[in-house]
Amino acid sequence: MRLILLSSLLLLGIFLANGHEEDPDGKVLNSLIDSLMHLQREFANLKDAFLTVHRARSFGSGSERLYVTNKEIKNFEALRQICEQAEGHIPSPQLENQNKAFANVLERHGKEAYLVVGDSANFTNWAAGEPNKAAGTCVKADTHGSWHSASCDDNRLVVCEFYFIL
């Protein structure tokens, strides 16, 4: 949609730069302006529809972040690539409600998944006796949302985190 808006602006700029000899009544210019205004309205409508869906999904999970699985089972490196390709992130719950939303996905699928824990995390949900570096350098969440040290080579449910800043 932004590409269309930019293209319309480019056409309008080219038209204005070349003068008005071929459009003495301004019909072409007015048509371009009308088209641009229509595209702006369509873009605003699309943005509103997107935000409505996002708010509805966020309301249901209690989290502004969305945790989505493609149901594949992969190791940590494959997860990183998949989430990056999807323009998402490896889950990194920063609040209890985010961890609950993440755990809900795991519980529905009956699988564990990887997550990353930030250095300055204010929220953690380590299981008793964790973290345990002997178990591995990665972190997995169980179906209850408890965190455990884990090997990065094990295959787990692919879950990516998406969040929107508008």
From Swiss-Prot:
Gene3D superfamilies: Mannose-Binding Protein A, subunit A. InterPro entries: C-type_lectin-like (IPR001304), C-type_lectin-like/link_sf (IPR016186), C-type_lectin_CS (IPR018378), CTDL_fold (IPR016187). Residues 46-161 form the C-type lectin domain. Expressed by the liver. Keywords: Calcium, Disulfide bond, Glycoprotein, Lectin, Phospholipase A2 inhibitor, Secreted, Signal. GO terms for cellular component: extracellular region. Its main location: secreted. Residues 1-19 form the signal peptide. It holds the Pfam family Lectin_C. One of its GO terms (molecular function) is carbohydrate binding. Belongs to the alpha-type phospholipase A2 inhibitor family. Homotrimer; non-covalently linked. This is Phospholipase A2 inhibitor clone 04. It comes from Bothrops moojeni (Lance-headed viper).
